[in-house]
Design a protein with these regions (language model features):
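Beta1/beta-strand and adjacent pyrophosphate-binding region of the FAD-binding site
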Residues: 7-21
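Conserved N-terminal/central alpha/beta ligand/cofactor-binding core
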Residues: 9, 27-131, 155, 167-184, ...
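Short hydrophobic core segments
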Residues: 16, 158-169
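An anion/pyrophosphate-binding glycine-rich loop and adjacent beta-alpha core
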Residues: 42-44, 198-334, 432, 444-516, ...
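Conserved beta-strand-loop-beta-strand element in the redox core of flavoprotein oxidoreductases
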Residues: 133-157
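A glycine-rich dinucleotide-binding beta-alpha-beta segment and adjacent secondary-structure elements
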Residues: 320-386, 426-440, 554-608, 613
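Active-site-proximal substrate-binding core of FAD-dependent oxidoreductases
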Residues: 404-411, 419-447
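Extended, charge-enriched "interface" segments that sit outside catalytic cores
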Residues: 457, 463, 474-632, 636-638
Length: 639
């Protein structure tokens, strides 16, 4: 059927939820040719930034660039609404540097909605999904080895699809808390999606609850910003997307502020009114993003905590108080806010609140983010136990790609409702992408608190730099049809130019006249420019100053060539470790492998293997508590 005449039935892919995971999932599926329906509770809130108005950060910025390299949208959306840019960790090595931007959150959501609306294979529908209908459902409601058939909405509609992607965010069975007040909402003033979490549990899925929170928003005109420290931004806004050449937009200013003993005293006197401490909230929150009352309680020796004052948009007078998340009552929020320097007359427009919500244990997923219990059902984002827009977007992209590929394989299946043998999932390894690291962590280790990406989680972070995302991923996306020919051609040109410049620097020697003009080169006399770059005291600027030929290349190409040379010995060593890892990753474990039939496995390892059901020997080796001797037994058993 054509993209113009398909109706709200018989879709290839249905995506549930219009947040950052849902945006990437629905666009990826539609762009791969799947007739896609995005169902969201409120069309007007698609792409809304529920918490801080920023994109990127340490390792998170790398994920955004990976999304872009794979043909996703988050990087382009960030470029379209960027109002400040900073490259984090500039004083440290390139493996831990990441871009972070402040975004105009209203423009971000508006641009996201328009992008979805104009996508030719995509429809948007406003309703609430309360159940996923599948085959192989027992009288008890439990599903074993079922396949997706349809979704059921709150208004009683049954909409069929070959694949469904759940990206429910904080809305599935969500509840917000502000002191003594609580309500079934996923965001302040927006009703929760009630019913779907219960339906999934009834089907046999292991469910849990996690918590997050957000700080209050404050009127800019009520704050004396002149007494606050300005947070310096980079002079030039650099794009996230490889498709964006330059960014020319008005820049906004962020500020730094600190809590003080008066703030902490107000908080301490009201610990008993916090639902976090009174027993109302039982769900676990993010370890690395605690509420202000949690910080004051856990670190009583600290006399102050740093806060960042961030604008919500260029056409908004609201400020976001980063680091001031709370679930305390509104009167307490007023008191503690006014103890801050410059905030004596501050006016809150939206109170801080905590929200807990239902999640699915990601141990029930495969590396394609498909559930093992129901074929064709994929999950992405906070439903899998992660936190953050970027983590959600990365998962959404992978889930959307695989939902489209699964649907395509179903269309060639002679018997509807059975698992398609032709389905070949699109997955990422740990050495390919931070997205690959994240998904492997989720499905191998599970979560007991909201998962956040850090560079320290990646063993191969020197290979996963933000500037190499296109080199690692664009060709793969091009091969499945998600990247354009122009993007692939640009990548080939980049690699050719970098290789050409590296070859030139390996051949060009440091002469006596150059060493005389640049004393720093004296100890490298007779060596190549490339050899000199191994010396940390020799800068790229010095090399370019001595080499007029390098002016033919862009700054990006010169920097890429420099890093390739400067870290080549480390990269070679890392490549050797990757080769060893790949051998274990290619040793696949059959999907329905009977671990009980393997003699020699320890009891605890047997239980862990059956719980995770790893896809490869490599994944099995990363399950916490699995011993090397058990891996050897397993390798013998699957041969």
């Amino acid at each position: 059927m054509s993209a113009m005449n398909f109706r709200y039935s018989d879709y290839d892919v249905i995506v549930v939820g219009g947040g950052h995971a849902g945006i990437e999932a629905s666009l990826a599926a539609a762009r791969l040719g799947a007739h896609t329906l995005l169902i969201t509770q409120t069309v007007d809130t698609i792409g809304r930034m529920s918490c801080n108005p920023s994109i990127g950060g340490v390792s998170k910025g790398n994920i955004v660039r990976e999304i872009d390299a794979l043909g996703g949208e988050m990087g382009k959306l960030a470029d379209a609404c960027m109002i400040q840019y900073r490259l984090l960790n500039k004083s440290r090595g390139p493996a831990v540097q990441s871009p972070r931007i402040q975004a105009d959150k209203f423009l971000y959501a508006q641009t996201a909605q328009y992008t979805l609306e104009k996508e030719k294979n995509l429809h948007i529908y406003q309703d609430t999904v309360v159940d996923v209908i599948s085959s192989q459902t027992a009288e008890s409601g439990v599903v074993e080895n079922g396949s997706v058939q349809a979704v059921l909405t709150a208004r009683g509609r049954t909409i069929s699809a070959r694949a469904v992607v759940l990206t429910t965010g904080t809305f599935m069975e969500g509840k917000i808390y502000i002191g003594e007040f609580e309500a079934e909402e996923g965001r302040l003033g927006e009703k929760a999606a009630i019913g779907l979490g219960t339906a999934l549990a009834r089907k046999g899925f292991t469910m849990g609850r996690l918590k997050t929170g957000t700080p209050c928003r404050v009127l800019r005109k009520s704050v004396d910003l002149s007494v606050l420290e300005i947070q310096e931004a980079d002079a030039v806004m650099r794009p996230f997307s490889f498709d964006t050449a330059e960014i020319f937009r008005p820049s906004a200013v962020c500020y730094v502020c600190y809590t003080n003993e008066h703030t902490h005293e107000v908080i301490r006197q009201n610990f008993h009114r916090s639902p976090l401490f009174s027993g109302k909230i039982h769900a676990t929150g993010a370890r690395y993003c605690p509420s202000i009352e949690d910080k004051v309680r856990k670190f009583p020796e600290r006399t102050r905590h740093q806060l960042y004052i961030e604008p919500e948009g260029l056409m908004s007078d609201e400020l976001y108080i980063n680091g001031f998340s709370s679930s305390l009552p509104e009167d307490v929020q007023d008191q503690m806010l006014r103890t801050l320097t410059g905030f004596a007359d501050a006016v809150i427009t939206r109170p801080a609140y905590a929200v807990d919500y239902a999640v699915i244990s990601p141990l029930q997923l495969g590396p394609d983010l498909q559930t093992r219990r129901i074929a064709g059902l994929f999950t992405a984002g906070q439903i899998n136990g992660t936190s953050g827009y970027e983590e959600a977007g990365g998962q959404g992209l992978i889930a959307g790609i695989n939902a489209a590929l699964y649907s395509r394989a179903c269309s060639t299946q002679p018997q509807p409702g059975t698992r398609p043998a032709a389905y070949e999932p699109f997955t990422l390894r740990r050495d390919e992408a931070y997205i690959g690291v994240m998904i492997d962590d989720l499905i191998t280790q599970g979560v007991d608190e909201p998962y956040r990406m850090f560079t320290a989680r990646a063993e191969y972070r020197l290979k996963l730099r933000h500037d190499t995302a296109d080199e690692r991923l664009t060709e793969r996306a091009f091969r499945i049809g998600l990247q354009k020919q122009s993007s692939f051609t640009r990548l080939q040109e980049k690699l050719a130019q970098r290789g050409e410049l590296i070859k030139h620097w390996r051949e060009r020697k440091i002469t006596g006249s150059l060493a005389e003009a640049e004393p720093a080169l004296q100890c490298h006399l007779g060596k190549s420019f490339a050899d000199a770059l191994h010396d940390p005291l020799i800068s790229l600027e010095l090399i370019c100053r001595c080499d007029p030929e390098s002016t033919r290349y862009s700054d990006a190409i010169k920097t890429a060539a420099e890093l390739e040379i400067r870290y080549e010995h480390y990269i070679i060593a890392q490549d050797k470790r990757i080769d060893k890892m790949k051998k274990m990753e290619t040793s696949r474990i059959p999907a329905n492998f009977n671990y009980d039939a393997v003699s020699g496995l320890s009891t605890e390892s047997l239980a862990r293997l059956k719980r995770v059901m790893p896809a490869t020997i490599g994944q099995a080796s990363r399950i916490p508590g699995i011993r090397p001797s058990d891996i050897m037994v397993l390798m013998v058993a699957i041969k």
